[in-house]
């Protein structure tokens, strides 16, 4: 790793790997793009333009060739390189600028410290040029947990609202807040500062004439922290003119006499976005106290880049999956500030398992579940299905039937659900294939004498008479298809001369077997008997005419 003095550049180790061997995976594409943007010899190939963090690729083929040389891939072209850039869209590292060709924009406030957790800002060397991008609003590559809920505020809100600070905050914190409120600056990068400033011993010819910046800001001069002199240092302000390698085409500085305080560290944001930003997250009163550092007053110890602090910092950033701008990482513990925490899907309490309870209507259960109650509620079982309801109705109908009113209630139950077969009728089920082979004794005389007797094919003695109320249910035993089939076979036997009497007896026997009552036996068979008699008479007349 070259020293910052050698390279003239002070990106941290994780952001730029100049000593990585060709073909290695130690450097990423966005690191390489930042490397090209900082070098003046590649200004005709790629350069900053437009908004903060926006750059344009002027020669896509040359950029792809340089990337291929760096990665030892001679077949690299811009098509492959653009696919690699699209991979960064989901990573929130950069995105494509709509309406502009070959123009992309870095999301510097989304570049978080994940893969390179242990860095020491105090050892960042001496050379801090202006060629690197400035500190973005709300954070930088060194993204600390926000000390205020400023990320969830809209940009149109008043940035000069007084900060929420406690009376126990340190005098240093109060002085910084007073200066920033007096300045009224909104954006962290409104002054064109970079996170990597120029060194104290830079070339005086590069600075335009003007009063020095250190004595230009209001308030007392910023004292160095006595307990840790290596972490925070006072850095000079940048030049007042436009910078050729800065993301800003024109520096937003009003002039050399702007009232700006010196920068504490290139890794820390300078001015608040909406509320007061602090030099370190642990200088804020919103940071939980109890640090064990030398400065126990105010918000606790300073951020020391210890493994515990870095672990706590990384855990805060891993919670930004759901509700990114309403994540709990934006609301640190502060006793005087009540912030409603968002409902996260992974922290919703699971309802307990519901025991067997009597069913309730679905509307009532939905209303009870939708209403938020402070106590735990039990879920009701789902309503009964069609089979369970039918079984319940059968049980109720059977109880009412055994109670006494058999006829009327049986008809009502039959209208709601199919009733069970009547126990009084002794009928053997006959399938469609076996129906033609059933042999029944001749009961044609009984049909005329005693039509109310139902007989089975194999039981010579007459069974008990059925109740008149159950006769309609018994008439449904024979399927309609079988009934038409037997009528057709009977007509065929009559036309073929097989004797109408035998066919008539078979039909009567089938009706007896299927358990039809006397009313039905006389009703549907009467027109059929007439038709069979007419057919028999016409057959006899035709035979007589043929004989004569």
Curated annotation (Swiss-Prot):
GO terms for biological process: cell differentiation; negative regulation of transcription by RNA polymerase II; regulation of transcription by RNA polymerase II. Residues 289-301 have a biased composition (Gly residues). Phosphorylated by multiple kinases including MAPK1/ERK2 at THR-526. Phosphorylation regulates the activity of ERF. Its main location: nucleus. The modification Phosphoserine is found at residues 20, 24, 185, 190, 327, 431, 435, 444, 531-532, 548. It comes from Homo sapiens. Potent transcriptional repressor that binds to the H1 element of the Ets2 promoter. May regulate other genes involved in cellular proliferation. Required for extraembryonic ectoderm differentiation, ectoplacental cone cavity closure, and chorioallantoic attachment. May be important for regulating trophoblast stem cell differentiation. Residues 431-451 have a biased composition (Acidic residues). InterPro entries: Ets_dom, ETS_fam, WH-like_DNA-bd_sf, WH_DNA-bd_sf. PROSITE patterns: ETS_DOMAIN_1 (PS00345), ETS_DOMAIN_2 (PS00346), ETS_DOMAIN_3 (PS50061). The modification Phosphothreonine is found at residues 3, 7, 441, 526. It comes from the Eukaryota. Keywords: Craniosynostosis, Disease variant, DNA-binding, Isopeptide bond, Nucleus, Phosphoprotein, Repressor, Transcription, Transcription regulation, Ubl conjugation. Belongs to the ETS family. Highest levels in testis, ovary, pancreas, and heart. It is found in: Nucleus. GO terms for cellular component: chromatin; cytosol; nucleoplasm; nucleus; plasma membrane. Residues 348-361 have a biased composition (Pro residues). This is ETS domain-containing transcription factor ERF. It holds the Pfam family Ets. Residues 362-373, 394-403 have a biased composition (Low complexity). GO terms for molecular function: DNA-binding transcription factor activity, RNA polymerase II-specific; DNA-binding transcription repressor activity, RNA polymerase II-specific; sequence-specific DNA binding. There is a cross-link at residues 465, 481, 512 (Glycyl lysine isopeptide (Lys-Gly) (interchain with G-Cter in SUMO2)). The keyword Nucleus applies. Residues 130-169, 184-225, 280-304, 342-478, 492-548 are annotated as: Disordered.
